[in-house]
Amino acid sequence: MNIQELGFQQTPLGELTLRRRVETLLGGREVFEVKLGDEYLMSSLFTESERQLATLGLGGLARELDVVIGGLGLGYTAVEALKNRNVNRLLVIDLFQAVIDWHQAGLVPNGEVLTGDARCELRQGDFFSLARTGFDTSDRTRKFDAVLL
């Protein structure tokens, strides 16, 4: 198995890495992984729960939506949210600036989709701290129709 490290950042929580590998047992499928130390945070092999979070979380809402997502990862929840025509604005908050940088640099498959959609804003921050004070630091009065975590 050939593993290529695409990104690395030392964080207070450990080493954060973005890896790409080709899985020969799956017909040469390209797999992207985000790891923190020895733990897998995200893999492009298993994305159904991330997609369903957006599909089910937004499915019953039938108006223009302002949505916030906690955690960017490989971007599957955010991309699925943007498929919903009612999503007017999407704010995605991730603890690690490196994860946002990887998307902005096009190192992950969903990076160009998210950075190319004017409805989507990627922002670094502590989602849980911001939940207490307001997710949008530039507009603390901003209200969200859905919070996906």
Give, region by region, the residue ranges found by the protein language model:
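Short, conserved beta-strand segments within well-ordered enzyme catalytic domains
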Residues: T17, E33-K35, V68
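Pocket-edge structural micro-motifs
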Residues: R20-V22, L36-D38, L45
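N-terminal auxiliary segments of SAM/dcSAM-dependent transferases
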Residues: M1-V31
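Residue-level preference for alpha-helix termini and adjacent loops
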Residues: G7, Y40-L41, G71
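The AdoMet/dcAdoMet-binding core of the Class I SAM-like
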Residues: T47-L149
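A generic short-segment signal for beta-strand/edge and adjacent turn/coil regions
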Residues: M1-E5, K35-E39, L61, N88-I93
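A short, structured beta-strand/loop element
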Residues: G27-M42
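Generic "edge-of-domain/loop-turn" microfeature
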Residues: E23-L25, L41, N88
